[in-house]
Amino acid sequence: MTFDSSPIAAIATAPGRGGIGVVRISGKDLSSVMRAVCGADKGSSLQARHATYLDFVNSDGSVIDQGLAIYFKAPHSYTGEDVLELQGHGGPVVLQMLLTRCLEAGADIGLRMAEPGEFTHRAFLNDKLDLAQAEGVIDLIEASTEAAAKSATQSLSGAFSKTIQELVDKITNLRMLVEATLDFPEEEIDFLEKSDARGQLTNIREALQRVFSQAAQGALLRDGLNIVLAGQPNVGKSSLLNALAGSDVAIVTPIAGTTRDKVIETIQIEGIPVNVIDTAGIRDAADAGDEVERIGIERTWAAVQTADVIVHMLDASRGPTRADEQITERFPANVPVMRVWNKIDLSGHRPAIDRMPDATHIYLSATGLLGMDLLRTELLHLVGWQQTGESLYLARERHLVALKSAHSHLEMAAQHAAHDNEATDPALDLFAEELRLAQERLSSITGEFTSDDLLGVIFSRFCIGK
């Protein structure tokens, strides 16, 4: 994202009709816009951080709307620049009229429409928030569960950034000791031994591992899970979807091939959004009823490739078949598989869970709602979810990659530090370099070392008024 410092404006509230709508303007000097849109008298006397009720007017003096004008003087604003917020009625037509008027009034100062995320980008550039906090803004807006919203607030408030910065500071202090040993080899003081550098490194590695665990758990809250129900026709996939959803979202009949296409329902399990994907029953193309069913089976296999967990449905009342084995053989090797034996009300089994070397086996009845809690718990167990009670960070993939990379560099540093090095030993230089790289990887999370291309991708995901 190329930075253009000219003033920007946009509608800051969501599209559609609402009780209140907001037009937001940010720039270095907005006095001419305030006078033009809010009237010469009131527009010239707006007090910072005070709400003033007034008319929003056209160039000919006609009233566009009535509402509140709030002026935030730099640097005490969201963006760190002068900000004017005009709060009027939330109709899309009147808001567009007000925005058009603002752009017209600000033409002489170069006022233009904001790009997506540009207000938050300016807040980042003006040190009002760091990159992890900026991502917390969009994560809070997009949160689909209460747990995800709470975790996003942790990032937005700076808790995640503070934790990362504490790790960076510890690595920096350790680097200073190593650099001192390298720079002053003639000194009799062993800086590394005296300060227990190896012990410090161990503590940093353990702390980083804890942060990664919290971030990985938070990533589940943010991204959710895709659970694909797959198996032969009439083994109870649609019944299981209905049982998980708590309503009849899928049609259930005794007729093989009833489900022709994917049926997706999003549920919550312990605050994690879970997309449960019911699919067409898998059988040989020669046995498929028609072309529509054959296409449905092809889409089943496509869905299986995108799954976080595959739930292989089987009929407990008839036991395993060769067709079940053939389906198993086609599952991706890198995706966890759970074998769910349905219809235990007909087989005489009790609800149970059996963790076998090949897969976890669960015995339940979808129609009788027996063993459903076992299924929910095991789904989260398979993807590493642990209800620890600790605060979680709504981490993104780039955060996890940076944390993993930093941990790898610290592991390498530990290997170099394991030797009793003299100050001239090349391993000590490598020790210092690995610490530097770990520090750099962690700093990329908060945006201290981040490319312009990455910034463009991150902020482009925001809505225009944010």
UniProtKB/Swiss-Prot annotation:
PROSITE patterns: G_TRME. Mg(2+) binds at S238, T259. It is an enzyme of class 3 (hydrolase). Pfam families: MMR_HSR1 (PF01926), MnmE_helical (PF12631), TrmE_N (PF10396). GO terms for molecular function: GTP binding; GTPase activity; metal ion binding. Gene3D superfamilies: P-loop containing nucleotide triphosphate hydrolases, Probable tRNA modification gtpase trme, domain 1, tRNA modification GTPase MnmE domain 2. Its main location: cytoplasm. Its cofactor is K(+). Binds 1 potassium ion per subunit. It comes from the Bacteria. It is found in: Cytoplasm. K(+) binds at N234, T253, I255, T258. One of its GO terms (biological process) is tRNA wobble uridine modification. Residues 224-384 form the TrmE-type G domain. GTP binds at residues 234-239, 253-259, 278-281. (6S)-5-formyl-5,6,7,8-tetrahydrofolate binds at R24, E85, K128, K466. GO terms for cellular component: cytosol. Its EC number is 3.6.-.-. PANTHER family: TRNA MODIFICATION GTPASE GTPBP3, TRNA MODIFICATION GTPASE GTPBP3, MITOCHONDRIAL. NCBIfam families: mnmE_trmE_thdF, PRK05291.1-3, small_GTP. Exhibits a very high intrinsic GTPase hydrolysis rate. Involved in the addition of a carboxymethylaminomethyl (cmnm) group at the wobble position (U34) of certain tRNAs, forming tRNA-cmnm(5)s(2)U34. Belongs to the TRAFAC class TrmE-Era-EngA-EngB-Septin-like GTPase superfamily. TrmE GTPase family. Homodimer. Heterotetramer of two MnmE and two MnmG subunits. This is tRNA modification GTPase MnmE. The gene is mnmE.
